[in-house]
A protein has these predicted regions:
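Histidine-centered phosphotransfer motif of kinases
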Residues: 86-94
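Membrane-anchoring alpha-helices and their flanking helix-loop junctions
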Residues: 1-81, 98-162
Length: 162
């Protein structure tokens, strides 16, 4: 394969990961109370957190040696279409979002809901960026993308990868 990405591409990929890490660290390690609590449900939040962690572990297991923190495929990586990848193209992102929603729900803090929304927006952009490289690297990716939902395992809506 020709050169995978430019330095600018790699810097943008690293920026996506850094912003993601900052949001997750704020969700996990901050506990700021503004005296307003919305939808604080400890046990449902904990259940969502656990489901998110399980999803991350299952997703990581499905891609094993192809796992990378950057939204750029590994040079010798393989296209994953089994396990949770059979149901959604980005189960790792979905699982992290479920975990993040759990953190927001269990705390009830409005800023954590805003961080969750920010993370969801970040993953929408990050996945679009990542899919450009996946489509270049794997011949079958476009077909897989057209048959498999991006984040939520619902009946397929028409979406075309360019």
């Amino acid at each position: 394969m020709a050169k995978r990405e430019t330095k600018t591409d790699r810097r943008l990929a690293i920026a996506y990961v850094l912003v993601q890490a900052i949001i997750l660290l704020l969700l996990i390690f901050t506990n700021i109370s503004f005296g307003v609590s919305i939808l604080k449900l400890a046990w449902p939040g904990i259940i969502l957190e656990a489901l998110g962690v399980i999803g991350v572990l299952l997703s990581a297991y499905s891609i094993r040696t192809s796992l990378t923190a950057l939204p750029l495929p590994k040079e010798h990586g393989q296209l994953a279409t089994s396990g949770l990848y059979r149901y959604v193209r980005h189960p790792m992102y979905t699982s992290v979002l479920v975990f993040a929603l759990g953190l927001a729900v269990s705390s009830g803090e409005p800023y954590k809901y805003l961080l969750f929304i920010g993370l969801a927006i970040l993953f929408a952009y990050k996945s679009k960026y990542e899919e450009l490289y996946l489509a270049k690297k794997y011949a079958g990716y476009r077909q897989y993308a057209n048959q498999t939902p991006k984040f939520i395992p619902l009946p397929r809506q028409k979406e075309t990868i360019k």
